[in-house]
């Protein structure tokens, strides 16, 4: 496994948790990351992400694991659709019910054709994935009010269910990008390379030491 030249670390601000990503963004993006969180149940989420030089997604692999259960998913574009492969062991729904939460259902999707319009992928709770459209659309250096409406394949955590979601990104200038999805809107602080510094209500980047 090749070493990575960059390391980014975020602390969750909405719950106990953190994310550490190792990456190489010199020619597109290759990233490996680990996110841990206690909400809705204690969970470790590992991912591997690869894009092309234009920052379009080539492959995403995610593994989520908690006490008594484990799930994985792989997403790959295949022509005009997405190939979705999943596996699961144990019983996530039982763990969720024991913690007072509703069941999660199955990982992946029964209708992969619903993802046909998705250009990017998004992983629930991870600020790294907001950088994909920011870099692909060059929003960190775009003129203020430059707006792009996109569809993403959103991977929910811990279920690893995948749903198509419409998102809107708007350049605000001075290292800020507005992110909106449904009724939710927030202004992301990003560095000159488009990596998230602060995602209000979710996470803040911790400087490397």
Question: What kind of region is each of these model predictions?
Answer:
Residues 24-29, 50-57, 76-81, 172-175, ...:
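Short, solvent-exposed coil/turn segments at beta-strand boundaries
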Residues 177-209:
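C-terminal structured interaction module
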Residues 15-16, 42-44, 67-68, 162, ...:
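Short solvent-exposed loop/turn micro-motifs enriched in small/polar/acidic residues
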Residues 2-53, 57:
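N-terminal ordered "arm"
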Residues 35-36, 61-65, 86-88, 180-182, ...:
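Beta-turn initiation residues at beta-strand->coil junctions
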Residues 40-97:
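Hydrophobic/aromatic-rich structural module bridging two neighboring secondary-structure elements via a short loop
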Residues 20-23, 45-50, 73-75, 166-169, ...:
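Hydrophobic/aromatic beta-strand elements that line small-molecule binding cavities or substrate pockets
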Residues 2-26, 77, 81-174:
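Solvent-exposed helix/loop surface patches that form functional interfaces
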């Amino acid at each position: 496994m090749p070493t990575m030249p960059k390391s980014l670390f975020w602390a969750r601000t909405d719950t106990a948790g953190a994310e550490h990503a190792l990456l190489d963004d010199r020619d597109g993006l290759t990233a490996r990351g680990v996110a841990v969180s206690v909400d809705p149940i204690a969970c470790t989420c590992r991912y591997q992400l690869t894009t092309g030089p234009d920052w379009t997604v080539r492959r995403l692999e995610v593994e989520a694991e908690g006490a008594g259960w484990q799930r994985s998913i792989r997403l790959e574009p295949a022509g005009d659709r997405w190939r979705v492969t999943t596996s699961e062991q144990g019983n996530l729904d039982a763990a969720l019910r024991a913690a007072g939460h509703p069941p999660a259902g199955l990982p992946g999707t029964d209708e992969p054709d619903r993802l046909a319009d998705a250009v990017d992928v998004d992983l629930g709770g991870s600020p790294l994935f907001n950088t994909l459209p920011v870099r692909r659309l060059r929003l960190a250096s775009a003129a203020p009010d430059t707006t792009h409406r996109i569809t993403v394949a959103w991977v929910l955590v811990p279920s690893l269910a995948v749903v198509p979601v419409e998102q809107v990104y708007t350049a605000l200038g001075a290292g800020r990008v507005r992110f909106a999805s449904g009724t939710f809107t927030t202004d992301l602080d990003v560095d000159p390379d488009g990596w998230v510094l602060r995602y209000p209500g979710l996470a803040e980047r911790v400087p490397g030491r």
